[in-house]
Amino acid sequence: MRIKSIYTLFVCYLAFFSCAKAPDLSETPALTLNGISKEKMKAGSVNQDSVILDIKLTDGDGDIGYVDNDTRKPDMFIIDKRTQQPYDSYILPSIPQQGINNGIIAQMKVKLYTQCCVVNPCDPDPGQADEALPLELYLVDRAGHRSNSLEINLILECKRQ
């Protein structure tokens, strides 16, 4: 009898302590920039150069990725701070709601392609100076919660031989 009660207590102990406590995550998505593959891109058009951003995403309710009557729409946005115009937007994969009661923590790799410089755009000019390319990246979840903004500062190499 004593061994049976010790065994029962041990099983209860394991059951109680083996359940990991869910992280306390906000329902508003949060982004963290872990790294950038390089700081400079050669200016140009149509995917001549790129950088890769390594981003950590957390979201308490996991409502990432839009599906609106089988129509996908962008949910991650990048703004060119030089012009305050959209630089690019992305459609993230939809996260199924089943099994995300504790939210999600994910790593993303985002590829940003180059574009032309503002001064003498995409025209060969060996005397042209490099340009700063400040970008703002943010995400909006299905509930409309906007994440924090990541400030990304790149350099466009505008000189071309």
In which residue ranges do the predicted regions lie?
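C-terminal motif of bacterial Sec signal peptides marking the signal peptidase cleavage site
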Residues: 15-18
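Bacterial signal peptide processing site
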Residues: 20-23
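Sec-dependent signal peptide recognition
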Residues: 2-9
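First exposed extracellular module after export/assembly in secreted or surface-exposed proteins
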Residues: 28-161
